[in-house]
């Protein structure tokens, strides 16, 4: 939940660019409570319901390439706290040491099964665990690695007022992000200077328009975007 007072925020978030977003969210505590309850209940239910799917995907991943079933990486969530995000592994073993921390289209590190999982966004399913643990929400700014968060402007830091999310309007808008990075000579640099600002503009707009019902709409829009 959101802290009660602006001055209770971590020092790095106590800047004037963040204050307007805090005030907006502070007036919508009922929606924030509904969001929190919905996240935990829905995540628990889906983990139980989808357990057979988890098993099938785990077998497919292990048979396709060497490595663990799950990929775990340090990301940043509410108030700048770091956590380990869970995903189904979609890349070759030790992929992070072989290239950028974001992927581009036709990235050679992505496995055959991994490509299928990514196209259907099934690699994100283990994040239900993160939601249940309170690290993430169904809807919110996608969690970035610390390196990218260090490039945030003061206003961008407002996205850290809420837990990171599995999906968002920005995620839907930039669902083909890897194509934008395909021809980049320096993928990390292009992501930070060109892609990230656009995504954060959408994320900040989402905070201004936040409501529990808007979250539900975003979840429905995400499902429709995946099916298209």
Residue ranges and their predicted role:
Residues 3-5, 14-16, 22-95, 130, ...:
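A hydrophobic, helix-centered structural microdomain
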Residues 41, 107-112, 197-203:
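Bateman (tandem CBS) regulatory domains
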Residues 104-169:
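A short, structured surface patch at a secondary-structure boundary
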Residues 25, 47, 101-105, 160:
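Residue-level "hotspot" positions that anchor or transmit function at local structural transition points
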Residues 55-59, 74, 148-149, 153-161, ...:
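Intrinsically disordered, low-complexity boundary segments flanking structured domains
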